[in-house]
Regions:
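Glycine-rich flexible loops
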Residues: 1-386
């Protein structure tokens, strides 16, 4: 069990979510095992037993997430309330845990998957495995980041970015990783005639997307169309470890392989039917999501429902921004994303992420994803004057 817990602690570090040697992962086997010794291990063990879960993670946040989450927790307790797609889908809000006790942890985690403990880090539980808790830690960090910058942009627009806010913003910007490169690494050139070739290309493109910071590994998806059969990442598959996690789904619906495919299968299939490009890449680059949520129409009657009902054509440069929730429901992005992407390099789904496409391989799709995120980051920091 120590091997399992230390593996997930190392994964948190590689993802840039936690400083080296700081993650505390607890998981059940015949007893509760921990990734490292810590004075809080008895507290986490008692919280796990009360919750009846298989795993509990306490992840001290790496910068800039630490500055962001400490800032938000101090000002928004008892709960941080982001508005991005991941929060709407997974959390509703992020409880702020008032003290490092089993009682306080259980009170928060009995109603939410993740929480924030000021001075300590992100708390997350998994009913069965550390993978579930890892996903939650990643989502809390992403949601906090997006909320911090969308709040800052709104304050600039309202003339309310005061000195404390400016100081926090300066610290966060100083800790940002580099922007995506103008020339991303070259990937295999298509078209790919066999599934073996396409799988290798998707594995490499998924890994590059994660390494460039364009998606957290547990989110996003990827597909490639070979003669009307769509190879697509499975639901919950990590983009940087796609080996064995791809399904082949006929576009004519003649197979049930799509049962384990990405939740965005319907959107990928809809795009494949109307666009001749074979390669589709979907990431969650943070600044593109942030800028998609930045709107000057404060009196809009759909304010608060922007992610599904935005009534106005919006763009980031030449890239359209469309509403649409996850899946194929009546307000699903399956209805908005495909027509917007036809003939364009990419499209941003409001509060969610970016879809791009390439004719024969993933080089064009990856380059477009980088370019959209670079422009979004530049526009955001320019608007904030930092």
């Amino acid at each position: 069990m120590d091997t399992l817990t230390t593996r997930f602690a190392a994964r948190l570090e590689r993802a840039g979510l936690c400083p080296p040697g700081r993650a505390l992962v607890a998981a059940w086997d015949d007893t509760i095992g921990f990734s490292r010794p810590d004075p809080l291990t008895p507290v986490l063990a008692e919280a796990m037993e009360r919750l009846g879960v298989g795993c509990l993670i306490l992840a001290p946040a790496a910068e800039p997430y630490r500055t962001i989450l400490e800032w938000q927790a101090a000002r928004e307790a008892p709960a941080i309330c982001p508005r991005d797609c991941e929060t709407r889908t997974f959390f509703h809000d992020i409880p702020v845990v008032p003290d490092p006790t089993p009682e306080a942890m259980v009170a928060a985690l009995s109603r939410r998957k993740g929480a924030y403990l000021p001075g300590y880090g992100i708390l997350a539980h998994g009913a069965l495995s550390p993978e579930q808790a890892f996903v939650t830690v990643s989502s809390v960090a992403f949601a906090g980041f997006v909320k911090f910058f969308t709040d800052a942009l709104e304050r600039v627009r309202q003339g309310r970015l005061d000195a404390p806010w400016r100081g926090a913003l300066t610290r966060v910007v100083a800790a940002l990783p580099p922007a995506p490169p103008e020339q991303p690494p070259r990937l295999a050139e298509g078209p790919f005639a066999t599934r073996t070739e396409a799988v290798a290309a998707m594995v490499a493109a998924g890994r590059a997307t994660v390494e460039l910071g364009l998606v957290d590994s547990v989110f996003g998806n990827i597909s490639y169309n070979i003669d009307g059969v769509l190879g697509i990442s499975q639901t919950g598959a990590a983009l940087d470890t796609l080996e064995g996690c791809l399904d082949w789904c006929p576009l004519d619906g003649s197979s049930c392989a799509g049962l384990t495919a990405s939740s965005e299968l319907a959107s990928h299939a809809a795009l494949a039917r109307v666009d001749g490009r074979r390669a589709i890449l979907h990431g969650h680059p943070k600044f593109a999501v942030i800028m998609s949520m930045d709107c000057p129409e404060t009196a809009c009657p759909e304010r608060g429902n922007c992610h599904t009902r935005c009534p106005r054509p919006r763009f980031l440069g030449e890239t359209p921004i469309v509403p649409g929730e996850v899946g194929a429901g009546p307000r699903g992005l399956v209805h908005t994303m495909p027509p917007a992407l036809v003939g364009r390099a990419g499209v941003i789904v409001l509060g969610h992420g970016v879809f791009t496409a390439g004719r024969d391989d993933f080089n064009e799709a990856l380059a477009s994803l980088c370019a959209i995120e670079r422009q979004a980051r530049a526009d955001c920091l320019s608007a904030l004057a930092v």
